């Protein structure tokens, strides 16, 4: 049994089964749907299809990050068991949750001076963030010490690529994730914008693609261009989707066709309710390991 805990926020958008199997702990963000508050608990409080159907019908959503008090109570359960902690946060480019974790860390280190609490800004989101967590769990299982796993995360977090497209950027604009000008372009008939996450963990529109068929090809082209080893890529590949499984499956099929050396099949996950509050339904995101991201 490891002497430290690997932990993240629920916004890593893996399944409960995946977190449990890999022994990755998580703490939940929160969101409101039409003024009723829920935990972003991997679809347990509200099934994903119900959540996205409500959004499509016009329901309002508002998210709230984990606060310092919640982090303190969460971290303390591990410290009381004599465990050190490696916690990886949702990207500081789209959330202030890193600051909450750092406040809790400072308070707890005074009370538990013999324990280590290491915090990493993932500079990632959704299952791309989850892909990083999965690799950190591999290193822990190989017997790597806490500091070595932390160093790996800090040195390699920008090698997780995040590419995604949506048929509607309305929710991205409403949530402040992209500008109104970019959203207006994305709203033109037949246009499917292709975005990625830059080296500061921000969402950046990159291409304006006409038709969904072409954007599916283009997103896989980006994987070919940026993946570690190109078409010989032998790492894992994750996809997240918000109520558009058929589109996600089409991307996965093309990835599996063009990258025969993948480590297993493409894993398709749901975009969780925190990230989904800002994407709305209709987003497909592709995640893989590659060369370091740039602005």
Listing of model-derived features with the role each one plays in the protein:
Residues 42-45, 95, 126-127:
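Alpha-helix N-cap/helix-start motif at coil-to-helix transitions, marked by capping-box chemistry
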Residues 45-52, 75, 80, 107:
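A short glycine/small-residue-enriched secondary-structure motif
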Residues 3-5, 79:
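A general secondary-structure boundary signal
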Residues 56-92, 99, 103, 150:
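Glycine-rich phosphate- or other oxyanion-binding loops that anchor nucleotides, phosphorylated ligands
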Residues 5-70:
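N-terminal glycine-rich anion-binding loop in soluble enzyme alpha/beta folds
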Residues 3, 11-19, 24-30, 86, ...:
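Mixed-charge interfacial surface used for oligomerization/domain docking
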Residues 34, 93, 201:
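Positions that flank functional sites
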């Amino acid at each position: 049994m490891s002497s430290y805990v690997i932990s993240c926020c629920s916004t890593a958008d893996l399944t409960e089964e995946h977190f449990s199997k890999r022994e990755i702990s998580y703490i939940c963000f929160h969101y409101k749907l039409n003024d009723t508050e829920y935990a972003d608990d991997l679809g347990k409080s509200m099934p994903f299809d119900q959540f996205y159907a409500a959004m499509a019908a016009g329901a309002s959503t508002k998210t709230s990050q984990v606060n310092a008090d919640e982090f303190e109570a969460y971290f303390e359960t591990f410290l009381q068991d004599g465990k050190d902690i490696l916690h990886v946060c949702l990207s500081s480019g789209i959330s202030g949750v890193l600051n909450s974790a750092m406040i809790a860390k400072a308070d707890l280190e005074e009370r538990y001076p013999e324990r280590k609490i290491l915090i990493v800004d993932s500079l990632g989101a959704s299952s791309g963030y989850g892909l990083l967590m999965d690799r950190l769990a591999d290193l822990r299982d190989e017997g790597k010490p806490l500091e070595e796993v932390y160093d790996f995360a800090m040195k390699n977090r920008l090698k997780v690529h995040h590419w995604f497209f949506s048929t509607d950027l309305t929710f991205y604009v409403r949530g402040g994730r992209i500008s109104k000008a970019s959203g207006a372009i994305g709203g033109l008939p037949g246009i499917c914008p292709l975005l990625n996450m830059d080296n500061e963990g921000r969402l950046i529109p990159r291409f304006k693609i006409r038709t969904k068929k072409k954007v599916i090809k283009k997103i896989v082209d980006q994987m070919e261009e940026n993946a570690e080893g190109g078409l010989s890529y032998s790492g894992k590949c994750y996809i997240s989707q918000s109520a558009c499984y058929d589109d996600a499956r089409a991307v996965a099929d093309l990835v599996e066709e063009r990258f025969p050396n993948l480590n297993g099949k493409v894993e398709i996950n749901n975009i969780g309710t925190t990230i989904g509050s800002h994407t709305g339904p209709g987003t497909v995101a592709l995640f893989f390991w590659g060369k370091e991201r740039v602005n």
